[in-house]
Amino acid sequence: MNIFRITADLAHAVAIVILLLKIWKSRSCEGISGRSQILFAVTFFTRYLDLFTSFYSLYNTVMKVLFLAGSIGTVYLMWVKFKATYDRNNDTFRIEFLVIPSIILALIINHEFMFMEVMWTFSIYLEAVAIMPQLFMLSRTGNAETITAHYLFALGSYRFLYIFNWVYRYYTESFFDPIAVVAGIVQTVLYADFFYLYITRVIQSNRQFEMSA
């Protein structure tokens, strides 16, 4: 079993749990970008279209269900149950600037021009940039609750750890997927400034997370 993939998936699962608990216990989705959460839900819906048509392993199926259910649950809590607490004034990133290029790229650059493959490729491109509305929202508000920072760190760690998974698979299986690798690197780079601030301010100084001016 690939320990790097398992660790990355666990980091992703932890991020989802942190976010859901944060919203449920505080009865508020303040500080969370509803637009990013919609993009994540679209990402996993289009990536896991094969959930009911293909079976690879129990682990794979459980993770697919967890990520999909977690994303849908988060969208429900933010846009339905606790919508009165959603900060629409600061969550203003134009997501069509992310969705449309992802669609175009998926149609042009893919492994095979078939519906399921194009949808999978689209999900990879979209996930790479889905965090941008959240980071944009942080830049507008200037700070975030510590629990929100923990969520974002766990989410960023998941993608960072997947880089080690790809390196491991390359050396053990001679497997290399340039689409997933390039998109993953782009996604990790987007988190770089956040990682630095998280480690220096939240972890080392035990302060509230604040974006630099």
UniProtKB/Swiss-Prot annotation:
Entry-linked Pfam families: ER_lumen_recept (PF00810)
Positions on the Cytoplasmic side per record topology: 22-35, 81-96, 138-149, 200-213
Lumenal side: 1-2, 54-61, 111-117, 169-178
Keywords attached to this entry: Endoplasmic reticulum, ER-Golgi transport, Membrane, Protein transport, Receptor, Transmembrane, Transmembrane helix, Transport
Keyword hit for Aminoacyl-tRNA synthetase: no
Highest taxon in the source lineage: Eukaryota
UniProt-listed GO biological process terms: protein retention in ER lumen; protein transport; vesicle-mediated transport
Single annotated GO MF: ER retention sequence binding
Places the protein is found: Endoplasmic reticulum membrane
Main location (coarse class): endoplasmic reticulum
Membrane disposition: Multi-pass membrane protein
Membrane-crossing residue ranges in chain numbering: 3-21, 36-53, 62-80, 97-110, 118-137, 150-168, 179-199
Record family assignment: Belongs to the ERD2 family.
Physiological role: Required for the retention of luminal endoplasmic reticulum proteins. Determines the specificity of the luminal ER protein retention system. Also required for normal vesicular traffic through the Golgi.
Protein name per the record: ER lumen protein-retaining receptor
Organism: Caenorhabditis briggsae
